[in-house]
Design a protein with these regions (language model features):
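N-terminal type II signal-anchor transmembrane helix
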Residues: 1-29, 68
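Residue-level preference for non-acidic, small/hydrophobic
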Residues: 33, 61, 119, 153, ...
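Short pre-catalytic segments that frame enzyme active sites
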Residues: 34-46, 172-176, 196-197, 201-206, ...
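Flexible, acidic/glycine-enriched loop-and-adjacent beta/alpha segments
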Residues: 49-115, 169-171, 380
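Conserved catalytic neighborhood of penicillin-recognizing serine enzymes
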Residues: 89-129, 183, 249-255, 366-424, ...
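Non-catalytic, structured segments within soluble enzyme domains
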Residues: 107-293, 297, 426-429, 433-438, ...
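Glycine-rich, acidic and aromatic/proline-enriched surface loops and short helix-turn segments
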Residues: 121, 125, 159-166, 183, ...
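A penicillin-recognizing enzyme superfamily signal
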Residues: 285-308, 318-320, 329, 334-345, ...
Length: 649
């Protein structure tokens, strides 16, 4: 009785419904509440009758979305069961398609929804995810099929489904993506377009994840082959065809395209694809236009001076340490040339990874005064692993402070060996570096930054040091308000204590010690900001493919990368001449009107004057000795000093 009553109520409700508009724009606001981007609403669809739809489009759509559309009713129980089975099998074989041997693709999860259900969701239902909404979907689908023929419903689907890039309906999609009429599209183009409604923003081959779009295209082709609509040769040829995309879209004029793309990705992850595509959202972001401008200008200006060193690109990210909010995100210098956001792409960090290695050491009872050997060492392996310092020289026994400040390679590998690769990886994960493959087979070279990580993760790790061991959650969205004025998302404050404040301060003390780093970097490098306390570290890979500078003040953490998107090598570009000048310019620019703040020193540290040559206590309380910081109970005592001196008597 209840079921019948519910059906009648929703069926009556359906009679008075009008299709919702998918043309409402989303508005992006910066941290000051000013609009910096509006995603233009989709233009009304250019309608096409089912008689004028090319057979290729019909075959591709039915094969990939609902192959039994003309045989089943509004709901397809067999399709739901089949989808559940496929999803189960995919989970068992890690996403490999039954056509993976043909196309080397990953299978898309099956939803089980019929074309009628998809149409209902697109034009009649809200974005809420609830049991009530699912019941409405079923009732509306039955009512739609009761009033319309299958051809009418299929025609409505093709004309009203959203394909991304402000294209409502497949005719508009054809023009926006390829600049062609629908009947002019090739198999390669059709198979790309018909797969887009599954996730229009993410799968857009123009502004989304192109690799994901290609995988979706391969899925469409595999389904067409499975349904015997095309041959294997046709499928393979279409998959290998280079698409001539019509990139002259509204996106070309976006002011901060990399940031906008990243915000959209975050929105899809947090709210779902439908919520964003339906429009009408007011998205309040963390972007500071002033800081973004400083970052862009510094990177563009400096890279222009490095052309003779084969440098074409730079990326940078600025994080507010107090809030974890991203104030600037520069994913590259030219969005029209490359839409790859380098701040979220994996690259080798080189020596900028060493603070993570030494943090692992501090977590395992080593100290800033622990001595490590800096000399020619064969660490074994085939071929033998014999790391060298950048300048080719060696300095004998050095303290951890000296080794890290001067970015000496051999001691970093030695520390990696002492604590173990696994503990280094766990420390990286602790600090927020999730992009490093925890299941990868890394050797001791991980201590020199041979593993690939993202700039965003590295900024998070360094910000953890700045926050005395509280790891921030980098965010680009503060809140989202929907078309009805309801706040549907509010970014929670999220800092997590992951590191002893004393260990964080010891690391900051080393990275901000300009006197200690003078041996390699000199006393007046671009890693200092006058009398403003700042901690910094450079990184350059052996092949000169990546050049980094990471650093922080109490207020901001800034990470900069310089290199080439295609991983081609730069011409012998040292760390201080690559990313560091950009980092210095950004740091100076964003702190120009800020008061000087010292790094907060936590309680409980032991302080002992230490000789940098012996790593032991000294009665001489001045340079070159250093006032070293220790966790309680880890400082060397005077007896160790006397034992050391006796050997010279």
């Amino acid at each position: 009785v209840i079921a019948v009553s519910t059906y009648i109520n929703y069926a009556n409700e359906f009679k008075s419904l009008t299709p919702k508009s998918n043309t409402t724009k989303n508005i992006f606001y910066d941290k000051n509440g000013k609009i910096f981007y509006e995603s233009f609403g989709a233009a009304p669809p250019t309608e096409v009758t089912i008689e004028d739809v090319p057979q290729l489009v019909i075959d591709a759509t039915l094969a990939s979305e609902d192959s039994d559309f003309y045989q089943h009713g509004a709901i397809d129980p067999a399709g739901i069961a089949r989808a559940a089975l496929i999803n189960f099998k995919n989970s068992k074989k890690n996403g490999l398609s039954r056509f993976s041997d043909l196309f080397n693709e990953e299978e898309y999860s099956q939803g089980g929804s019929t074309i009628t259900q998809q149409l209902v969701k697109n034009i009649y239902l809200s974005n809420e995810r609830s049991f009530d909404r699912k019941i409405k979907e079923v009732v509306y689908a039955y009512e739609l099929e009761r009033k319309h023929t299958k051809d009418d419903i299929f025609e409505m689907y093709l004309n009203n489904v959203y394909f991304g890039e402000q294209s409502l309906g497949i005719v508009n999609a054809s023009k926006i993506y390829f600049g062609k009429e629908l009947k002019q599209l090739s198999l390669a183009e059709v198979s790309m377009i018909v797969g887009l409604p599954a996730a229009p923003s993410r799968l857009s081959p123009i502004s989304g994840d192109f690799e994901a779009a290609k995988e979706r295209q391969k899925y469409v082709l595999s389904q067409m082959y499975y349904e015997e609509k095309i041959t294997l040769e046709e499928a393979q040829k279409a998959s290998a065809t280079t698409l001539n995309l019509n990139a002259e879209t509204e996106r070309a004029s976006i002011k901060y395209p990399y940031f906008v793309d990243y915000v959209k990705k975050e929105l899809r992850d947090k709210l779902g694809e439908e919520a964003y595509e339906s429009g009408g959202l007011k998205i309040h972001t963390t972007l500071d236009p002033g800081i973004q401008k400083i970052t862009e200008q510094a990177a563009t200006k400096h890279v222009a001076t490095l052309k003779y060193r084969n440098v074409t690109n730079a990326a940078a990210l600025v994080l507010d340490n107090k809030t974890g909010e991203v104030r600037a995100m520069l994913g590259g210098l030219d969005y029209n040339k490359s839409k790859v956001n380098v701040t979220t792409s994996k690259r080798q960090p080189g020596s900028s990874f060493k603070p993570i290695v030494y943090t692992a050491g501090l977590l395992n009872k080593y100290t800033a005064s622990s001595r490590l050997w800096d000399g020619r060492v064969n660490f074994g392996g085939i071929p033998p692993y014999i790391p060298r310092n950048y300048d080719g020289g060696y300095r004998g026994y050095v303290t951890v402070r000296t080794a890290l400040s001067n970015s000496l390679n051999v001691p970093a590998v030695e520390m990696t060996k002492l604590v173990g690769v696994e503990k280094v990886l766990k420390t990286a994960e602790l600090l927020g570096i999730d992009s490093l493959d925890q299941n990868g087979e890394f050797g001791l070279s991980i201590g020199l930054g041979s593993g690939e990580v993202t700039l965003l993760d590295m900024v998070q790790a360094y910000s953890t040091f700045a926050n005395l061991g509280e790891r921030p959650n980098p965010t680009v969205i503060n809140s989202v308000v929907d078309s009805s004025g309801s706040e549907i998302y509010l970014q929670p404050e999220s800092k997590e204590r992951v590191l002893d404040p004393k260990i964080s301060y010891i690391m900051t003390s080393i990275l901000s010690d300009n006197y200690a780093r003078r041996l390699v970097f000199g006393s007046n490098s671009v890693l200092q900001l006058g009398n403003r306390p700042v901690a910094a570290k450079t990184g350059t890979t052996d092949s000169f493919a990546d050049n980094w500078t990471m650093g922080y003040t109490p207020q901001y953490t800034v990470g900069v990368w310089v290199g080439n998107n295609d991983h081609s090598v730069m011409r012998s570009l040292p760390g201080l001449q690559g990313a560091a000048p950009i980092w210095n310019s950004v740091m100076k620019g964003i702190h120009q009107n800020l008061k000087i703040v010292n790094f907060e020193k936590p309680k409980g540290l032991e302080e002992v004057w230490i000789s940098p040559y012996t790593g032991l206590p000294s009665t001489y309380k001045n340079k070159p000795n250093v006032l070293e910081y220790f966790l309680p109970g880890t400082a060397p005592d005077r007896n160790e000093r006397f034992d050391y001196l006796r050997q010279f008597r």
